[in-house]
Amino acid sequence: MKSGSFSHVGITVSDFNRAVKFWWEIFGCPLVGVTDAPPDRVRGFFGVDVPGATCKIGWIRFPGGAVIEIFHFEPKQPPVAIPWNRVGQTHICVNVRNIHKWHDYLVSKGVEIVSKPEQSPRGHWLFFVKDFDGNLIEITDLRHMYYVLRWLGPLGGWIFRRGMYMKYYA
C-alpha cells in the first residue's frame, strides 16, 4: 500500500488567536476549521492528566493543501527548549519564490530571523525563522528543483529505491 499526499503537521501554541493571526498575516494561510476538545478527550486521547484541561484545535491551510494543525491547551505548560539532536520533529518548511524578498519581508514584519539566506550545495536557497512560540520554520526557495521534485520525484523515488538508496530499505 502507498499513502496519499502529505496532509498535516501539528504544533502546540501558547495563544490560539495569535497563531491564527501569525499564519494569516505572515504567510496568507487561513484558518479553515476549529473544534474544542473537552477534558475527558484531552485526558484520554492526548494523555494530559490535569483536572479540567481543555484543548482548542484549529486547522490552518497552505496553498496546495497541506495543513498546520494547532493545539491550544488550558492550562498552559511552560515551553521547553528542544535540541535538534533529539529524536522527533525539528522544524516545518515553507516553499517560497524569491528568497531574498521573503527575508526582507519577514524582517519588516518583525519575525525572529535565525539565519540569513544561504545557498545549499544542491542549489536551492534557504533560511530559518521562529514563530512567536519559538517553533522553527525553514523558508526555502527550491528554484528549478521545485519542478524536478514535483514532476520527477515519483520516478526518482522509484529508481533510487532500487539503486543508490537500496541499503536504507534493508
Regions inferred by a protein language model and the residue ranges of each:
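Acceptor-substrate binding/catalytic loop of class I
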Residues: 9
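A short, polar/charged loop-to-alpha-helix boundary motif
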Residues: 144-159
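Vicinal oxygen chelate
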Residues: 14-17, 31-33, 62-66, 72-136, ...
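Core segments of cupin and vicinal oxygen chelate
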Residues: 12-64
